[in-house]
């Protein structure tokens, strides 16, 4: 089977990593309870920033956010390694900017994710991502972003939301922990 995965906030805990960096850079101590209550993908409001200030902060820290100590979600690496071992095809489909594609791929490999050159795609806007997902005929796709998930509802693909504070309003199947994927596959077969 073909499995597709978004990367940020689906396989790796990027927003929480960025949240800690913001606290450090701004010399603040905004609690994780605030982070977990955010209803938007963007985290700047928790620090009293405008959209413009938040965008500037995010872009100024991009390399540090993407390539330092950001952790994969528990069991994400092991789960994808197991899928690969079972003979499934794993696709990574991310909206990360083109200039970060190759370094992101290298970073994922260093973390232990099974990455194949011909199944790693980056630099796509949401609309492109959606068309591409349909074009390659994935059996399963996992993402955190409401705009992507909502557009795939009703398409011939099993779509799952990686549970986050900002996608709770979606009424679609979800995955909270990567340990659940084996059971999901068994149920669907």
From Swiss-Prot:
EC number: 3.1.3.-
Gene3D superfamilies associated with the record: HAD superfamily/HAD-like
Transmembrane stretches, start-end: none
Keyword Lyase attached: no
Main EC class the enzyme belongs to: hydrolase
Swiss-Prot/TrEMBL GO biological process terms: deoxyribonucleotide catabolic process
Keyword set, alphabetical order: Hydrolase
GO molecular function: 5'-nucleotidase activity
Presence of the UniProt keyword Hydrolase in the record: yes
Family under the similarity heading: Belongs to the 5'(3')-deoxyribonucleotidase family.
Protein name stated in the entry: Putative nucleotidase BC_3386
Organism of provenance: Bacillus cereus (strain ATCC 14579 / DSM 31 / CCUG 7414 / JCM 2152 / NBRC 15305 / NCIMB 9373 / NCTC 2599 / NRRL B-3711)
